[in-house]
């Protein structure tokens, strides 16, 4: 289970999320109570372990500017949280190692999410960062995509959300804060633990899928 702690504004909170077992740390560059400057984030990511996926979150920024910031300060991923077109998302993905495309729950574009050519698709509440929970039945995994579930998640409901939706990953902002822009260590720890536990329970309940043997020697070169 991929766990992303987003809305991080300080080195202290970034290192806290890492210590608690997060896979990814998100930094918001769009106007928000949690907005941080690229220069500040550049200093923070230098101090994080190399295995952590560092993500810049953008809303309606030009594709060129997204690539410039991500690559310029050493981030590993971009999260596009605006009205980007499939062509813009693909253009960014050709130049950035990992891209997440976010959609509001119920948005018609989700049906064509695969056209964006990104690494994962996020389904969020209609008001991102509001802490509002939406109807999880609206968060079906788009065909051929990895789903990251966001929107109103917190330590007490993330397990239920994972059990119902069965996403590839989860993302949290307000649900692990003591106040906007500041993470609460106990909440971060509890959130990561609950997400991991829910994923393990799903694996234990599900029967393994039988995979037919594959003869690599018979593979036809493309």
Provide a role label for each language-model segment.
Residues 1-222:
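Conserved N-terminal beta1-alpha1 strand-loop-helix module at the mouth
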């Amino acid at each position: 289970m991929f766990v992303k702690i987003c809305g991080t504004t300080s080195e202290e909170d970034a290192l806290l999320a890492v210590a608690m077992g997060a896979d990814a740390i998100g930094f918001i560059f769009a106007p928000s109570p949690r907005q941080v400057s690229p220069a500040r984030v550049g200093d923070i990511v230098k101090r994080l372990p190399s295995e952590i996926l560092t993500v810049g979150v953008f809303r309606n920024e030009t594709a060129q500017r997204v690539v410039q910031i991500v690559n310029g300060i050493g981030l590993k991923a971009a999260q596009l949280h605006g009205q980007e077109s499939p062509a813009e998302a693909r253009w960014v993905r050709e130049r950035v190692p990992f891209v997440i495309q976010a959609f509001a729950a119920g948005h018609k574009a989700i049906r064509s999410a695969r056209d964006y050519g990104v690494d994962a698709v996020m389904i969020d509440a209609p008001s991102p960062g509001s802490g509002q929970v939406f109807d999880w039945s609206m968060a079906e995994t788009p065909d051929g995509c990895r789903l990251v579930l966001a929107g109103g998640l917190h330590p007490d409901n993330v397990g239920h959300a994972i059990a119902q939706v069965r996403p590839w990953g989860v993302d949290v902002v307000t649900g692990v804060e003591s106040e906007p822009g500041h993470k609460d260590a106990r909440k971060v720890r509890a959130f990561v633990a609950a997400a991991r536990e829910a994923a393990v329970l799903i694996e234990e309940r599900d029967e393994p899928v039988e995979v037919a043997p594959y003869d690599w020697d018979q593979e036809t070169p493309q």
